[in-house]
Amino acid sequence: MRSQYCGDVNKSHVGQEVTLVGWVNRSRDLGGVVFLDLRDREGIVQVVYDPDLPEVFDVASTLRSEFCVQVTGLVRARPDSQVNKDMRTGEIEILGKGLTILNSAAPLPINMDKNQHNTEEQRLKYRYLDLRRPEMADRIVFRSKVTSAVRRFLDDSGFLDIETPILTKATPEGARDYLVPSRTYKGQFFALPQSPQLFKQLLMMSGFDRYYQIVKCFRDEDLRADRQPEFTQIDIETSFMSSAEVMAKTEEMTRGLFKDLLNVDLGEFPKMTFAEAMRRFGSDKPDLRNPLELIDVADILKDVEFKVFQEPANDPAGRVAVLCIPGGAKLSRKQLDEYAKYATIYGAKGLAWMKVNDLDKGLEGIQSPVLKFLNEDVVNGLLERTNAKTGDLILFGADKANIVAEAMGALRLKAGEDFDLLNGEWKPLWVVDFPMFEPTSDGGLHAMHHPFTAPMGITPEQLEADPTAAISDAYDMVLNGCELGGGSVRIHNSEMQSAVFRILGIEEEEANEKFGFLLEALRYGTPPHAGLAFGLDRIVMLMTGATSIRDVMAFPKTTTAACPLTNAPGFANPAQLVELGVNVIESEDNKEEQE
């Protein structure tokens, strides 16, 4: 039905007759000549119909937005004065000779113009129309190019694309599972996988030493801009490769993606330990485009007569750190109050500040609500440590170390955006040497990555003797403050795996009930293995400049995990529930909806 895509027609086709199909992006009648912008997934081309062919011209005059049409015409160069440099096809146009309406379009329920606003609900309800818009179509096409490039690289590197089950068993991976009732085993449930973690480890035990899969994963968790109940991972696992080798291979793949698809040279990724990232940036996924760093000042403030500073400065578990924001002294008191309120979201009890109005005037050039507690030596020490200049603002964080890191890390990001401090387009890095465990609110321990991550350089006995000192052989790839992917070396012997379960409070009976198959498999010559999983949606979001992963998924859910297009989720037929042995407990929420 067509000779090429609309967006592919160029000056090399001048003088040729082409047949194109697509949708009417815009139609206008200018002085007896109809100009038609025809659009398909590859772009837009201008078609011109004049009255010399009255039958075709009359049909062209009836066209409206989103009519689906077939066009035949002659490619001709535009005069220099009419070249449109904003269009790929802006040097040419099609002189229309034939026109067939393949399907008409009713008045549209959403605005198709990129400059017109549609609500998120409207866009998702009429997603098939929203996806026709060039900026959306471009992202979906780009996503396809990413997956093709990933497959090509991994296939060429000897990896095997192997599918793993979707109906599986619940595993403790940090979020709620989506459950699927079994008809044949009434009262029992499958779980949709949060990741293929255990199956890909079992594939290593099966001898398939290089595995990958572009796979759907499911997590029933609270949603944010970068979260969806179903999402896609680029899942990778290898045997007989160290963490350094896995990092090198996946870094090579990532650099290739950016070079091939964006012509961006990311260069070699620097490595930073978790401890250094938290100390300098207050985050385990630091945005290195932001030049601000947390600066420790507990030694300067440990003797001041101000408990807010003094107590954490002398507490082994406390921390006092500052941010020095260039030009920040221009913030008003109201704006500083907004910063303080923002810090409380992340656990801070308040926010002390110091304005450097005039460095040459000593204490007289300093403005701060806590200045009365600070002598000249302390102020000079702070100014020297932070290298503050006239016009700068110093923000103080003083509390338990984890609260200071989280609150000051959040303020660092906010200040970086507010003061336009971000420099450089792409700043990748590896974050390594994570703690094996982190404390829970009830005094227990939680695996920082997952329970199958191996510790570095210790025995099971040493791990159980002091689990909080253990460092995991884990690694995260971070780009511009976003975690692209995370992975680790896995535990490959049953003694170490059982020790980790005990530390996490998973007793032997529970471990055997949930993971007996894994513990059994570990007894039969399991090879050393390691892997990594990338968030495909997040990678495409960053590479295309989208603000949400919803804009790089064809049919995403809303922030309440619903699909306005299909009205999913919905109520099941009562007969189906009886067959499944499932009884719905009535609540006020679902009672109203069923009525």
UniProtKB/Swiss-Prot annotation:
Binding residues for ATP: 219-221, 228, 483, 535-538
GO BP annotations, alphabetical order: aspartyl-tRNA aminoacylation
Region Aspartate, annotated ranges: 197-200
Enzyme Commission (EC) number: 6.1.1.12
Keywords: Aminoacyl-tRNA synthetase, ATP-binding, Cytoplasm, Ligase, Nucleotide-binding, Protein biosynthesis
Reaction(s) catalysed (UniProt annotation): tRNA(Asp) + L-aspartate + ATP = L-aspartyl-tRNA(Asp) + AMP + diphosphate
Principal localisation: cytoplasm
Function: Catalyzes the attachment of L-aspartate to tRNA(Asp) in a two-step reaction: L-aspartate is first activated by ATP to form Asp-AMP and then transferred to the acceptor end of tRNA(Asp).
Family of this protein: Belongs to the class-II aminoacyl-tRNA synthetase family. Type 1 subfamily.
NCBIfam families assigned: aspS_bact, PRK00476.1
Quaternary organization: Homodimer.
Protein name in the entry: Aspartate--tRNA ligase
Species per Swiss-Prot/TrEMBL record: Shewanella sediminis (strain HAW-EB3)
Organism lineage string: Bacteria, Pseudomonadati, Pseudomonadota, Gammaproteobacteria, Alteromonadales
Name of the gene encoding the protein in the UniProt record: aspS
